[in-house]
Curated annotation (Swiss-Prot):
Entry-annotated residues carrying Phosphoserine: S447
Top-level class of the enzyme under EC nomenclature: ligase
Keywords: ATP-binding, Cell membrane, Endoplasmic reticulum, Fatty acid metabolism, Ligase, Lipid metabolism, Magnesium, Membrane, Microsome, Mitochondrion, Mitochondrion outer membrane, Nucleotide-binding, Peroxisome, Phosphoprotein, Signal-anchor, Transmembrane, Transmembrane helix
Protein name from the UniProt record: Long-chain-fatty-acid--CoA ligase 4
Activity modulation comment: Both triacsin C and rosiglitazone inhibit arachidonoyl-CoA ligase activity.
Tissue specificity remark: Abundant in steroidogenic tissues, also found in the kidney, brain and liver.
Cytoplasmic side of membrane: 29-711
Pfam families in the cross-refs: AMP-binding
GO MF annotations in UniProt: arachidonate-CoA ligase activity; ATP binding; long-chain fatty acid-CoA ligase activity; very long-chain fatty acid-CoA ligase activity
PANTHER family documented for this protein: LONG-CHAIN-FATTY-ACID--COA LIGASE, LONG-CHAIN-FATTY-ACID--COA LIGASE 4
Cellular component aspect of the GO annotation: endoplasmic reticulum membrane; lipid droplet; mitochondria-associated endoplasmic reticulum membrane contact site; mitochondrial outer membrane; mitochondrion; peroxisomal membrane; plasma membrane
InterPro entries registered for this protein in UniProt: AMP-bd_C_sf, AMP-binding_CS, AMP-dep_synth/lig_dom, ANL_N_sf
UniProt xrefs under CDD domains: LC_FACS_euk1
């Protein structure tokens, strides 16, 4: 075996020699042609600085230091004006695209479950003028049905073109839009609809039949339901007095001359645009009130960090539009003339679960240049690709590693490796269509390991951002020239960020070498508070002596010397153990989530106990293979319940924890393996795949008692 490895190593020597010669010959012309010197200088420059020498002073972007940006396009101070600007500028250009469903087939899985598989056609596009026509017709139709300006209308629907058309209608006609995640459970949906007192609801037939129908008995105010599909439903199955319309019929009503002639009542910057209900990761969803001016300011900051945004770009929309990251990204793309092609997590790639084998996924057909992704999705891509690499033979694996390491070194220096991109990473890039020039990451911290992998294999920068629903998604975004990892960039030009001492956690603005503390964001992008929840609004929001709004995030950050922010902890994730040690559950999870055997992990601790435990969703393929090697037999559920497999996972956890330099008391010493993945549909994670700790605790209550010895 050693002889074989030595022979292969000798055979691979010419590869190393070729790389050395290639680097020497190509580097100098490439360096000047790509303006690498300027990019390096941009990457290393100071990006933000404090407004004064006083500790705790707010940091601002150096490019907009004297005042915060509040508007991007002159005169467009409301969302409807952004829409009108885009329609006037890009009229006949493709705007919103949807793939045709050619056929559906049921496919039996080995476990007996039946999966619906789709065969999809090409994207069908409507242009900006056609979107405008539909918006006008839908708005006039809603007005004809009796909806008044400043009266709320709710949307509970999957991400699709009709969602965006409905939203643009509401912005133009001054109907405050109440947004609800399509994956919310019955209790959360009922709460949001009743609290917002929305009398009109936009949804899909699937959600109407599967979730809303049974909940209508508890929903007080909804009088009109508009479904977006071109389908028919049996109205006799619904309560009397509830009017149900198709979106098409409402548009046809609005297109009548007597209705279309009624002009919309336009909003002002201080009018409510959205009441966005959160995903409820920490309990009951809260409605965040966003004025037009808040969203305009937030998107002004976000767009400044995406160079070259314009008509040559194609954006793939698949994340929930009820999430502030996706909504602001799509409105920004629409404003700048980008095409938006709609997708879903189940049809995104050729290997996605709803795509029939041999058919093409949405990325392959659309070939997007821009896309947003939550870290959970990037982590899955990373693990899947690296799993394929491990299955290669020795020569292939070694060639991949040589190319990967070489490009990684080039990236760390601020350079690139065009030959590696062409030869080694072309197939990996093709997983997302092959044309992605920038990816936006948000919703949760992205691990440095996954960040580097995406840089290397997908040959594009990752704009890692930090923002919250309460800040209209705006806070920080890394610049495309900044190839560091583990940070979320400098404050956007629309806001300023300061740190506040958190003595209990041991973080202060006087810490060395860098100031640390709770992140507080200020600017016009800060929303107006929580809907009908003055107590929580007063707790989390404040207004300073200059009238500027601030939001206390609950996240702990550290400012680096160049003005970039790093998220290092979260107040709500901190647990004090019985012996007095503080454990950051988020820190533990971040350190362990990239273990090959682990698909997802939730750390758990109680203040009356002395150790940390964990719940783990194992990687089915890898754990099944390990079980075979260890002689463990049975179903997937049997494998997950086997103590020997728990021991193997704990062994991997210990190794990874030691490699990441976790303290002894931070390392989970007991584990419960979950045979079922945590998806938004299970209610255990949000649509951005953030852990719902309360729900996870309730779900694993018996296991918690068992792992803590029945106490």
């Amino acid at each position: 075996m050693n002889l074989k490895l030595n022979v292969l190593t000798i055979i691979l020597l010419p590869v190393h020699l070729l790389i050395t010669i290639y680097s020497a010959l190509i580097f100098i012309p490439w360096y000047f042609l790509t303006n690498a010197k300027k990019k390096n200088a941009m990457a290393k420059r100071i990006k933000a600085k404090p407004t004064s020498d006083k500790p705790g002073s707010p940091y601002r972007s150096v490019t907009h230091f004297d005042s915060l940006a509040v508007i991007d396009i002159p005169g467009a101070d409301t969302l409807d004006k952004l829409f009108d600007h885009a329609v006037a500028k890009f009229g006949k250009k493709d705007s919103l695209g949807t793939r045709e469903i050619l056929s559906e087939e049921n496919e039996m899985q080995p476990n007996g479950k039946v999966f619906k598989k789709l065969i999809l056609g090409n994207y069908k596009w409507i242009n900006y003028l056609e979107v405008n026509c539909r918006v006008n017709n839908f708005g006039s139709g809603l007005t004809a049905l009796g909806l008044k300006p400043k009266n709320t209308i709710a949307i509970f629907c999957e991400t699709r073109a009709e969602w965006m058309i409905a939203a643009q209608t509401c912005f133009k006609y001054n109907f405050p839009l109440v947004t609800l995640y399509a994956t919310l459970g019955r209790e959360a949906v009922v709460h949001g609809l009743n609290e917002s007192e929305a009398s009109y609801l936009i949804t899909s037939v699937e959600l109407l039949e599967s979730k809303l129908k049974a909940a209508l008995v508890d929903i007080n105010c909804v009088k009109h339901i508009i479904y977006v599909d071109n389908k028919t439903i049996n109205r006799a199955e619904y309560p009397e007095g509830l009017e149900i319309h198709s979106m098409q019929s409402v548009e046809e009503l609005g297109a009548k001359p007597e209705n279309l002639s009624v002009p919309p009542s336009r909003p002002t910057p201080s009018d409510m645009a959205i009441v966005m209900y959160t995903s409820g990761s920490t309990g009951r969803p809260k409605g965040v009130m966003m004025h037009h001016s808040n969203l305009i300011a937030g998107m002004t900051g976000q767009c400044e960090r995406i160079p070259g945004l314009g008509p040559k770009d194609t954006y793939i929309g698949y994340l929930p539009l009820a999430h502030v990251l996706e909504l602001t990204a799509e409105i920004s793309c629409f404003t700048y003339g980008c095409r938006i092609g709609y997708s879903s997590p189940l049809t995104l790639s050729d290997q996605s679960s709803k795509i029939k084998k041999g058919s093409k996924g949405d990325c392959t057909v659309l070939k997007p240049t821009l896309m947003a992704a939550v870290p959970e999705i990037m982590d899955r891509i990373y693990k899947n690709v690296m799993s394929k690499v491990q299955e290669m033979n020795y020569v292939q694996k070694t060639l991949f590693k040589i190319g990967y390491d070489y490009k990684l070194e080039q990236i760390k220096k601020g350079y690139d490796a065009p030959l590696c991109n062409l030869i080694l990473f072309k197939k990996v890039k093709a997983l997302l269509g092959g044309n992605v020039r920038m990816m936006l990451s948000g919703g949760a911290p992205l691990s440095p390991q996954t960040h580097r992998f995406m840089n290397v294999c997908f040959c594009c920068p990752i704009g890692q951002g930090y923002g919250l629903t309460e800040s209209c998604g705006a806070g920080t975004v890394t610049e495309v020239t900044d190839y560091t990892t583990g940070r979320v960039g400098a404050p956007l030009i629309c806001c300023e960020i300061k740190l506040k001492d958190w003595q209990e956690g041991g973080y202060t603005v006087h810490d060395k070498p860098n100031p640390r503390g709770e992140i507080v964001i200020g600017g016009q992008n800060i929303s107006m508070g929580y809907f009908k929840n003055e107590e929580k609004t007063a707790e989390d929001y404040c207004v300073d002596e200059n009238g500027q709004r601030w939001f206390c995030t609950g996240d702990i950050g550290e400012f680096h010397p160049d003005g970039c922010l790093q998220i290092i902890d979260r107040k709500k994730d901190l647990v004090k153990l019985q012996a007095g040690e503080y454990v950051s559950l988020g820190k533990v999870e971040a350190a362990l989530k990239n273990c090959p055997l682990i698909d997802n992990i939730c750390a758990f601790a109680k203040s009356d106990q002395s150790y940390v435990i964990s719940f783990v969703v194992p990687n089915q393929k890898k754990l099944t293979l390990l079980a075979q090697q260890k002689g463990v037999e049975g179903s997937w559920v049997d494998i997950c319940n086997n103590p020997a497999m728990e021991a193997e996972i704990l062994k991997e956890i210990r190794e990874a924890a030691n490699a990441m330099k976790l303290e002894r008391f931070e390392i989970p010493i007991k584990v419960r393996l979950s045979p079922e993945p945590w998806t938004p549909e299970t209610g255990l994670v949000t649509d951005a795949f953030k852990l719902k700790r309360k729900e996870l605790k309730n779900h694993y209550l018996k296991d918690i008692e068992r792992m803590y010895g029945g106490k």
